[in-house]
């Protein structure tokens, strides 16, 4: 069990388990490089030490979300724009993803969590594509919670890919122009079948959404914290959820 929930008093725990509990939480895990710079005296040997420390933060966040009954948790791991970073950093990040897939698979099995990856996965190294496919296949029968990693993801890229596929289906007369609706477009997105996020958390304090789930977050509640991702704990997640529960969602009405 998450240490944060173990330490929560009964009133706090009951409050967190009461509605409205977000069914789908999305997190922009920002601040890894700033954390590394802040701790550079300990991080000189590795260009992605901050990202490695950030990866260590993930299990307790997943545990806490699952224990609370969150149905889906989406983590923004690598954007389409991140390819503009140095080849060395990008290669090390992909190596980190590979190692995490291997080391955390038993974690997912133990908790019966289904893994899903979204983004333009075809642009990833073949080894990483293969490992993602294996991990997704190995957990596809689980239903406790769905953990979604956005890798080489950009919302504009997602929409372009979706519209190309939709156009192809129109051309092949699989669908008609009159069938096009918000629901149909959503079914062509990487997140097809998932509820739109109820809560979007951004760590690191930046006030922007960074080309993340732009279609899906039309009515999502936003929560920004100055805490850098490697320092983000289950307590910080609970604070975000408490803030969400105190808001009145109107869906644009």
UniProtKB/Swiss-Prot annotation:
InterPro entries reported for this sequence: UPP_synth-like, UPP_synth-like_CS, UPP_synth-like_sf
Cofactor needs: Mg(2+)
Protein residues bound to substrate: 31-35, 51, 79-81, 83, 85, 202, 208-210
Domain of life (superkingdom): Bacteria
Cofactor, how bound (note): Binds 2 magnesium ions per subunit.
Matches recorded under CDD domains: Cis_IPPS (cd00475)
Enzyme Commission (EC) number: 2.5.1.-
Chain sites annotated for binding Mg(2+): 30, 221
SUPFAM superfamilies (UniProt xref): Undecaprenyl diphosphate synthase
Entry annotation: catalytic residues: 30, 82
Gene3D superfamilies named in the record: Decaprenyl diphosphate synthase-like (3.40.1180.10)
BP-aspect Gene Ontology terms: polyprenol biosynthetic process
Any single Pfam family the record assigns to this protein: Prenyltransf
HAMAP family: ISPT
Family: Belongs to the UPP synthase family.
Biological function: Catalyzes the condensation of isopentenyl diphosphate (IPP) with allylic pyrophosphates generating different type of terpenoids.
Protein name: Isoprenyl transferase
Organism: Chlamydia muridarum (strain MoPn / Nigg)
Record lineage: Bacteria, Pseudomonadati, Chlamydiota, Chlamydiia, Chlamydiales
The gene coding this protein: uppS
């Amino acid at each position: 069990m998450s240490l944060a929930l173990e330490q929560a008093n009964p009133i706090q725990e009951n409050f967190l388990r009461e509605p409205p509990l977000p069914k789908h939480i999305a997190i922009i895990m920002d601040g890894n490089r700033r954390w590394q710079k802040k701790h550079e005296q300990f991080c000189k040997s590795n260009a992605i030490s901050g990202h490695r420390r950030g990866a260590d933060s993930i299990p307790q966040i997943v545990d806490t979300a699952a224990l609370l009954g969150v149905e889906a948790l989406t983590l923004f791991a690598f954007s389409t724009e991140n390819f503009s970073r140095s080849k060395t950093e990008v290669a090390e990040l992909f190596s980190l993803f590979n190692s995490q897939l291997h080391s955390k698979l038993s974690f997912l099995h133990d908790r019966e969590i289904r893994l899903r990856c979204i983004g333009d996965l075809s642009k990833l190294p073949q080894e990483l594509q293969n490992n993602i496919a294996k991990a997704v296949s190995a957990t596809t029968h689980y239903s406790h919670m769905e953990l979604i990693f956005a890798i080489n993801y950009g919302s504009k890229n997602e929409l372009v890919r979706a519209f190309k596929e939709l156009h192809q289906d129109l051309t092949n007369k699989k669908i008609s122009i009159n069938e096009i609706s918000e629901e149909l477009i959503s079914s062509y997105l990487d997140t097809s079948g998932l509820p739109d996020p109820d809560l979007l958390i951004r760590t690191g304090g930046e006030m922007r959404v960074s080309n993340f789930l732009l279609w899906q977050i039309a009515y999502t509640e936003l929560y920004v914290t100055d805490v850098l991702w490697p320092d983000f704990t289950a307590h910080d997640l609970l604070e975000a959820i408490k803030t969400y529960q105190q808001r009145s969602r109107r869906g644009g009405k």
